[in-house]
Amino acid sequence: MSEAFFVLLKVHLYFPESGSLKAKRSELNAVKAHLRQRMGASVAEVAHQDSWQRSTLAVALAGRSASSCLQAADAVRRMLDARFPQGVRVDGRLASWDDLDAVG
């Protein structure tokens, strides 16, 4: 049985009220800080850096069990749904260290 699990989330955000890159980055930096500081996630903006109304984030969470990782991912989804009522899409994958070993 694996001793390490992780969840990778691809988060698609929409900022309809943002009128500039500066406004988007201000809101996005607050979201990234919350994910890092309150939820212990690793976060990177991976697409749409030059778009003022869209952003795509990669979010990674690690834990000792699959259930703890899934609970953490669920908490991230709930936080994002509350913060972005106009719409957010989150795609996720759960894997274990053993899964990585099997890939090579």
Task: Identify the role of each PLM range.
Residues 2-42, 79:
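N-terminal first-folded block
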Residues 4-8, 52-54, 87:
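A general secondary-structure signal for short beta-strands and their flanking turns/coil
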Residues 9-13, 57-59, 90-94:
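A structural signal for short, well-ordered beta-strand segments
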Residues 15-17, 63, 96:
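Non-catalytic surface loops within mature trypsin-like serine protease
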Residues 23, 27, 51-53, 61, ...:
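Generic, well-ordered alpha-helical segments
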Residues 41-47, 89-90:
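A short linear hydrophobic-aromatic micro-motif
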Residues 44-64, 98:
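Short, charge-patterned binding micro-sites
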Residues 65-104:
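C-terminal structural segments of small proteins and small subunits
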